[in-house]
From Swiss-Prot:
Cofactor(s) it depends on: [4Fe-4S] cluster
GO biological process terms held by the UniProt record: aerobic respiration; electron transport coupled proton transport
Protein name as it appears in the record: NADH-quinone oxidoreductase subunit B 1
Chief place where the protein resides: membrane
Top EC class of this enzyme: translocase
GO CC annotation terms, alphabetical: plasma membrane; respiratory chain complex I
Known partners and oligomeric status: NDH-1 is composed of 14 different subunits. Subunits NuoB, C, D, E, F, and G constitute the peripheral sector of the complex.
Organism from which the protein derives: Chromobacterium violaceum (strain ATCC 12472 / DSM 30191 / JCM 1249 / CCUG 213 / NBRC 12614 / NCIMB 9131 / NCTC 9757 / MK)
Gene: nuoB1
Length: 158
């Protein structure tokens, strides 16, 4: 957690930033935005074998209850405004994981007229998970990388 010091009376000192970021990493609530075959792997990661609950990741049905969006699959032009609307409804601070080649850059359908060439053109992306489709382990690694990124951010403005 980034313990600053341990005093002789049994007290531990740390900064407010490190404490807040530590608690945020243990309670990521993703809003699932499954668009294609990558969503199946995302569901696989949430099932019993990989059990994202042990990392504090609990899938939420509403954008107002979530702070993480996992964009999994091909994003078409008609779906892009809905993606942005859901992102805007999420509570601050919010993070985005782009899962799969199609969400990262269009993937197999990159040259199609109806496909957005990367969801980072619509919403800011924090972590990219490569693969077609990426495995559940890759998504798990992406979530761990996001947790490490959250621990390094400053939460209190100076």
């Amino acid at each position: 957690m980034g313990v600053e010091g341990i005093l002789e009376k049994g007290f531990v000192t740390t900064t407010a930033d490190k404490l807040i970021n530590y608690t945020r990493t243990g309670s990521l609530w993703p809003m699932t935005f499954g668009l294609a075959c990558c969503a199946v792997e995302m569901m696989h990661a949430g099932a019993a074998r990989y059990d994202l609950d042990r990392f504090g990741v609990v899938f939420r049905p509403s954008p107002r209850q979530s702070d993480l969006m996992i964009v999994a699959g091909t994003l078409c032009n008609k779906m892009a405004p809905a993606l942005r609307k859901v992102y805007d409804q999420m509570a601050e601070p919010r993070w985005v994981i782009s899962m799969g080649s199609c969400a990262n850059g269009g993937g197999y359908y990159h040259y199609s007229y109806s496909v957005v060439r990367g969801c980072d053109r619509i919403v800011p992306v924090d972590v990219y998970v490569p693969g077609c489709p990426p495995t559940a382990e890759a998504l798990l690694y992406g979530i761990i990388q996001l947790q490490n990124k959250i621990k390094r951010t400053n939460t209190i403005a100076r």
